[in-house]
């Protein structure tokens, strides 16, 4: 799949377009849906995809509620126009979470990564208190809890990557807070026999954010591309959102974990050179490839759900086309090149 996007509206429509498999999964599942932490980079598109998927399945009466702090009220209003109910809520406030609407299906996106170096206490709080409140409120529901591939340690860059059996012994406060998020949620889910899937998402990308965006913008601006983290795995955000919906069926007792990323192991240097070819710029590099990297083995995901619809090169072409025409950026660098886990 390779699309070009004339504007933000066209891009947002694409990112919220459900796959046929996501529609079929929603048709098999029962209950209303709540999306916790829906105000971030991925949340609005995921909430819209759920709404559109239910509508496509003829289940228009089922309710979709997006929950976030919603400091940007325009974001909430836009969701409401698309028939997604919104609730402004501090997801670390157990009393406020207890008042959220009932749901049989929960997508939990709440988390904090950036700013950990300056405020580590808040990172630990967000990544543990919010899932604890959610697991109490929605005990018995099917829950997909977004996690990260950073829960694993760095692995040899020439190996297959960390799989779900790899010990969770990462570097850095953020990654360890992410492990704590999984442990707290797993404990509470097991105690209440709540079906839970730990969705270890590894570098979702779209034109305004992500590793490809970061590399493409640096190449376009003539800025050096850091290749110390020499290899990456990626997945197009629409594919990741569709998989999150499908993973509601994979939520299990005891909790299950799944690495969610693309099939291809990409060289950052080669990625920059590809962006340079598409943008008409010669990339500049800094650093040298380390012998280890954050890489993930997602064969279990692909065996169950099949490969993502969007290839890595299709994603590169879509991002570079967006960057070339001066499309907007979220202005949130991924810091993918970090090797010590300090974000």
Which stretches of residues belong to each language-model region?
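Conserved Rossmann-fold NAD(P)-dependent oxidoreductase catalytic core, especially the SDR/UDP-sugar
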Residues: 32, 105-108, 113, 129-173
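N-terminal Rossmann NAD(P)H-binding glycine-rich loop of SDR-like oxidoreductase domains
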Residues: 32-52
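Catalytic helix-loop patch of NAD(P)-dependent Rossmann-fold dehydrogenases
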Residues: 119-125, 129-130, 151, 156-198
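Glycine/proline-rich active-site loop of Rossmann-fold NAD(P)-dependent oxidoreductases
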Residues: 179, 191-195, 204-214, 221-222, ...
């Amino acid at each position: 799949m390779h699309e070009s996007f004339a504007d933000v509206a066209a891009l947002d429509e694409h990112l919220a377009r459900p796959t046929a498999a996501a529609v079929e999964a929603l048709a098999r599942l029962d209950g209303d849906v709540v999306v916790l932490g829906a105000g971030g980079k991925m949340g609005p598109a995921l909430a819209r995809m759920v709404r559109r998927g239910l509508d496509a399945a003829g289940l228009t009466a089922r309710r979709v509620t997006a929950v976030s702090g919603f400091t940007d009220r325009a974001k909430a209003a836009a969701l409401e126009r698309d028939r997604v109910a919104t609730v402004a809520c501090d997801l670390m406030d157990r009393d406020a979470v207890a008042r959220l609407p009932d749901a049989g299906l929960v997508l939990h996106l709440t988390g904090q990564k950036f700013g950990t170096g300056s405020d580590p206490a808040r990172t630990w709080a967000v990544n543990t208190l919010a899932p604890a409140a959610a697991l109490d409120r929605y005990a018995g529901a099917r829950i997909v809890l977004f996690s990260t591939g950073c829960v694993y340690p760095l692995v040899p860059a020439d190996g297959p990557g960390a799989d779900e059996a790899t010990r969770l012994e990462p570097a850095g406060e953020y990654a360890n807070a992410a492990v704590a998020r999984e442990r707290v949620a797993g404990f509470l889910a097991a105690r209440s026999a709540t079906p839970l899937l730990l969705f270890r998402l590894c570098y979702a990308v779209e034109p305004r954010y992500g590793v490809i965006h970061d590399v493409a913008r640096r190449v376009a601006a003539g800025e050096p591309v850091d290749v110390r983290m020499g290899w990456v795995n990626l997945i197009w955000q629409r594919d990741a959102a569709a998989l999150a919906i499908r993973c509601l069926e994979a939520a299990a007792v005891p909790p299950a974990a799944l690495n969610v990323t693309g099939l291809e192991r990409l060289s950052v240097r080669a990625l920059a050179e590809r962006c340079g070819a598409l943008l008409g710029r010669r990339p500049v590099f800094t650093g040298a490839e380390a012998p280890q990297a954050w890489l993930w083995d997602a064969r279990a995901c692909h065996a169950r759900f099949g490969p993502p619809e969007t290839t890595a090169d299709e994603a590169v072409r879509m991002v570079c086309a967006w960057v070339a025409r001066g499309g907007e950026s979220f202005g949130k660098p991924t810091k993918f090149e970090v090797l010590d886990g300090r974000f």
